[in-house]
C-alpha cells in the first residue's frame, strides 16, 4: 500500500472504495456497498461517529492513525475479514454490540420486527421472551429494550457464543432481567414457557454453505450450517415449541433461503411468512395454537 499521498480521512475512504472494488470484496455484514463499508471502517477504526460532518473528512491523520488504518484495510482486503470483527463491534436495531469470531455478525431482518414491537402479531406485552440460538445476544437484548418489563433468556449451544452474549448483557446493564442458558435447542430449558420465542438458528444448507463468499467463512460454522437442507435444528425446534410457548405465545424463526425446504417438508402447515420493508426474507411465524395443532406432524418429520 503506497500511503505517501493518503493524508486525510477522505483520502483513505476514497482509496479503500477503489481497492474494495478491485479486490471483489463481498458486502453483507452490516453494509451493502463499498462506499459505506469504507466509511464504516475508516471512521470506526479511529473511533469517530458515522454521522460526522463531511467537513471533518479533510482532517489530516497522525502517523500512528495512518498505520493502524492501513493495517485494518489490509486485513479487510487480503484476509476478507468482515468489518465488524476488525472493529469488534456491530450495530443491530440501532444498538451497539461487541462481536468477534465466536459469533455471527448481527444482520437479521428480525430487527425490523423488534423495532415495530412485533405489531400487529403479538397479542399482549410479553412477560417472558426467549432468544434461541442467541449468538451475540443481539436479538434478545434488542427485545429487552423494546419490552422494558420482560424477562429475556438468551440460549445457545456454544459456550463461546454465550461468553460474548454475557459481555453484551453487561455492556447494556441488563443483568437483572436478561440471562444466558447453555444447551442444545430447548434442552437447557425444561418446563419453561415463553410468550415470545424468536430464533435465528443455523439454517444454511450444504450447497449454499459451500458457495458462500470468503467473508462468511470467518464466522463460526456452528452458527451457519445445519445439515443437507439446513433444517436439522429447525425440525427439532418445531417439534418441541408447543411445550415451551405460553397459551397465546408466538414462535418467530428465520430460515432464509431454506424457506423452500420448510415449505416442501411441511406442506400441511399454514406458516405466516413475514414481509420486510428494508429487505430480508425467509422468516416465518406460528402461533402457540398452531404449534399444538401440528405437534405430532412436526415430531413425525424429525427424521428426513
UniProtKB/Swiss-Prot annotation:
This is Ribosomal protein uL3 glutamine methyltransferase. It comes from the Bacteria. NCBIfam families: hemK_fam, L3_gln_methyl. GO terms for molecular function: nucleic acid binding; protein-glutamine N-methyltransferase activity. It comes from Pseudomonas aeruginosa (strain ATCC 15692 / DSM 22644 / CIP 104116 / JCM 14847 / LMG 12228 / 1C / PRS 101 / PAO1). InterPro entries: DNA_methylase_N6_adenine_CS, HemK-like, Ribosome_uL3_MTase, SAM-dependent_MTases_sf, Small_mtfrase_dom. Belongs to the protein N5-glutamine methyltransferase family. PrmB subfamily. SUPFAM superfamilies: S-adenosyl-L-methionine-dependent methyltransferases. HAMAP family: L3_methyltr_PrmB. Its EC number is 2.1.1.298. CDD domains: AdoMet_MTases. Gene3D superfamilies: DNA helicase RuvA subunit, C-terminal domain (1.10.8.10), Vaccinia Virus protein VP39 (3.40.50.150). GO terms for biological process: methylation. Keywords: Methyltransferase, S-adenosyl-L-methionine, Transferase. GO terms for cellular component: cytosol. It catalyses: L-glutaminyl-[ribosomal protein uL3] + S-adenosyl-L-methionine = N(5)-methyl-L-glutaminyl-[ribosomal protein uL3] + S-adenosyl-L-homocysteine + H(+). Methylates large ribosomal subunit protein uL3 on a specific glutamine residue.
